Amino acid sequence: GKSSATLLISSDPEKGFTQIADSDSLFNYPAYRYSDSIYGGSIWDMVEYNNSLYVSICTGTEDNMPNNNTMQSFALVRGDQNADGTFTWTPVAGDQKKDGARYTFGIDPERTRSGAANLMVFNDYLYIGEYNDEEIALERILFSKTGKNADGQFGGGLDCRFLNANLDQSVNLYRMDKNENMELVVGNSTKMFPNGSLSGLKSGFGRNENQYIWRMEVYDGKLYVGTHDASSLLECFGQFVNGNLLKRTPSEWKDQWSYLKALMKALQTVDPNGNGNPDALAQTIKFSYNFVFKNITVRNMASAIKLLNYLRTAKRGFDLYVTEDGVNFETVTIDGFGDPYNHGLRVFATTDQGLCLGTANPFYGTQIWIQRKAD
């Protein structure tokens, strides 16, 4: 069949769904292949606002990359239901020339890093939180995949330019009124927003390591905003400049030494499937030689140094902020509730007991926290 993103609707899921949109009706914006932005994030988020359905879409593909270190930013479209149940789609943020969108991809033409956007309605505004493309950025380092159709290699490289560009532009928070006028709530000043943000806060709530506004939730008349902190995953680099190596306990150093001894022992193990061909060793040495001299370049070293400068003062662990008026924010945490391995606030759930949240923690597993309902 036809390859396409699809959007379905149902008033009774047990009786089935009706398709209301596909890639064609969504202006061919959805990027849904693995090589695309955020591993093909496609139709990313949706919310009802002002009697319309607003949908954020990942659009970045290898074919529309502005340059080797930039994917095309997200789109925002509005769906209005017709009398016969079909939907008419209008681009709000997208291709201004071709499709007549009011805003460009990513809303602000100076903002180029966010592959997706998360949506939440609060106080009669639609809040739009940016989500930077960290997947491709980290893939560049892990597998040395740089540029269109790069095959990559096991063991990675040191090309940190994509990641550094993300850190240069940490995430913004916008809000849109019922007339689709945009305001900058959190972010740096640009030509589009010369006076800066309504809150006075810079991009990433003033912290470059905040790379997603991952989840938002309305609870007890307040808007809660949680982030993803990239510095948790980048501690393998950050530990060399943030002082954490000096803070290691004797037990931690003992564990590290045990890991090194285990590695050396594994390297000495004889491969029972080996064929005794000495040329195989020569090929291994040749690969290692080529790998080092391909990756240890002036450009890559400069990009690594720039990355280390960002990580020097980064505070690991997700951030959580709360606001009653949608503009002035209070800080709940900037360090994942004291756990640097809680790198993201992944999900909220409102219950009769209070506001629950689940952390993203790929190191030793998720945690669930609750803020009890006020009496």
Regions found by a protein language model. Give the residues of each.
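Extended amphipathic secondary-structure runs
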Residues: E48-N51, V55, L119-I128, S170-S189, ...
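Extended non-catalytic domains of envelope/secretory-pathway proteins
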Residues: I43-D45, S52, S56-T59, W89-N118, ...
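Signature of short aromatic-glycine-proline-rich micro-motifs recurring in repeat-based ectodomains
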Residues: P30-E48, R102-V121, Q169-S170, L198-V218, ...
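Beta-propeller blade signature
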Residues: S3-G16, N67-F87, I141-N181, G238-G276, ...
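Surface-exposed loop and turn segments in beta-propeller and other repeat-based domains
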Residues: T18-S37, F87-E110, E180-N208, D255-A282, ...
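Solenoidal tandem-repeat scaffolds enriched in leucines and small polar residues
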Residues: G1-Q96, R111-L119, D124-L126
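Blade-level signature of beta-propeller repeat domains, shared across WD40, Kelch, NHL, RCC1
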Residues: E217, L223-G243, H343-D375
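Entry beta-strands of beta-propeller and related beta-repeat scaffolds
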Residues: G1, E48-S56, G60, V121-G129, ...
